[in-house]
Amino acid sequence: AYLPPLSTEALLKQVDYLIRSKWVPCLEFSKVGFIFREHNASPGYYDGRYWTMWKLPMFGCTDATQVINEVEEVKKEYPDAYVRIIGFDNMRQVQCVSFIAFKPPGCEESGKA
């Protein structure tokens, strides 16, 4: 990553923007924080593109601290996983924003955990 990790205050601002934009916050986690190929040799197929969703999308969420509290829960349950926050536009059915909220201790910037 080219940017330093976001502070809790910066995460709150990003999530506030996401909520003000009427996007639905979602959390995802993965033990591998980069795109990789494992199960298919065909061009353009990447196993690491999809992460595991934490619970359900947070429909109706109006408070950024609710999202940050969920990030803390993911960190406790999966301390060696990357956590990202997604903003999903449920009207257009597209992902509008995605950013890393947590990197596990000891991860390398080179793309390997």
Swiss-Prot record:
The keyword Nucleus does not apply. InterPro entries: RuBisCO_ssu, RuBisCO_ssu_dom, RuBisCO_ssu_sf. It is found in: Plastid, Chloroplast. One of its GO terms (cellular component) is chloroplast. Keywords: Calvin cycle, Carbon dioxide fixation, Chloroplast, Photorespiration, Photosynthesis, Plastid. SMART domains: RuBisCO_small. CDD domains: RuBisCO_small (cd03527). It comes from the Eukaryota. Pfam families: RuBisCO_small. GO terms for biological process: photorespiration; reductive pentose-phosphate cycle. The basic functional RuBisCO is composed of a large chain homodimer in a 'head-to-tail' conformation. In form I RuBisCO this homodimer is arranged in a barrel-like tetramer with the small subunits forming a tetrameric 'cap' on each end of the 'barrel'. Belongs to the RuBisCO small chain family. RuBisCO catalyzes two reactions: the carboxylation of D-ribulose 1,5-bisphosphate, the primary event in carbon dioxide fixation, as well as the oxidative fragmentation of the pentose substrate. Both reactions occur simultaneously and in competition at the same active site. Although the small subunit is not catalytic it is essential for maximal activity. Heterohexadecamer of 8 large and 8 small subunits. This is Ribulose bisphosphate carboxylase small subunit, chloroplastic 3. It comes from Triticum aestivum (Wheat). The gene is RBCS3.
